Curated annotation (Swiss-Prot):
Superkingdom assignment: Bacteria
Name of the protein in question: CD-NTase/cGAS isopeptidase
Motif JAMM motif in this chain: 100-113
Keyword entries, A-Z: Antiviral defense, Hydrolase, Metal-binding, Metalloprotease, Protease, Zinc
InterPro entries in the record: CAP3, JAB_dom_prok
Catalytic site: 38 (proton donor/acceptor)
Other comments on record: The sequence of this protein is available as NCBI RefSeq accession WP_024167427.1.
GO BP annotations listed: defense response to virus; proteolysis
Keyword Protease applies: yes
GO molecular function, one term: metallopeptidase activity
Organism: Escherichia coli (strain TW11681)
Domain MPN: 9-147
Length: 156
């Protein structure tokens, strides 16, 4: 395992691994300046039994509407990236959830975040919700309408 990967676990010791390339891309969107706008996209990767591996993300595009504390993903490129990777992998790489940034050091979901995740993401499989803050990442797993924060696993 690469030391730059992030690993999180749920209450049942199911893992969510964020590959190092994805960690680097997510970190590049941290809102470190007072003029930085919110960024976001889709989380894409592999389902390995009860474990999830995030291997790719879609990134902000010119059609997305972004401001300091809000984001509307309007670009069709987000879905196109999911579709392309799904086809290239013969259905092995799939949509796993959503990510976006917050202009705070230690992020947590807002009421709007939770409402949009519960209402907007309908899936029979567990989905991942991720918020990139200036110093830390908040990550949760959505199963049906229940969202639980995951714990960071220390990797030796």
């Amino acid at each position: 395992m690469n030391m730059n990967e992030l690993v999180f676990i749920d209450d049942f010791d199911n893992h969510v691994v964020i590959m190092s390339e994805v960690v680097m891309r997510l970190n590049s969107y941290r809102q470190t300046h007072y003029t930085s706008t919110e960024s976001g996209g889709t989380l894409i990767g592999e389902r390995r039994g009860q474990h999830l591996v995030i291997t790719h993300i879609s990134e902000p595009g010119q059609d997305d509407v972004r401001n300091r504390t809000g984001l509307e993903r309007k670009g069709i490129h987000h879905q196109q990236k999911v579709n392309d990777l799904f086809q290239q992998s013969n259905g092995f790489i799939v949509y796993l959830g959503e990510w976006h940034t917050h202009p705070e050091d230690f992020p947590h979901p807002s009421f709007i975040d939770i409402k949009s995740w519960v209402m907007g993401i309908v899936a029979t499989e567990p989905m991942i919700m991720l918020i990139v803050g200036r110093k830390d990442i908040w990550i949760g797993k959505k199963i049906k309408n229940d969202i639980k924060k995951l714990k960071k696993k220390m990797v030796s």
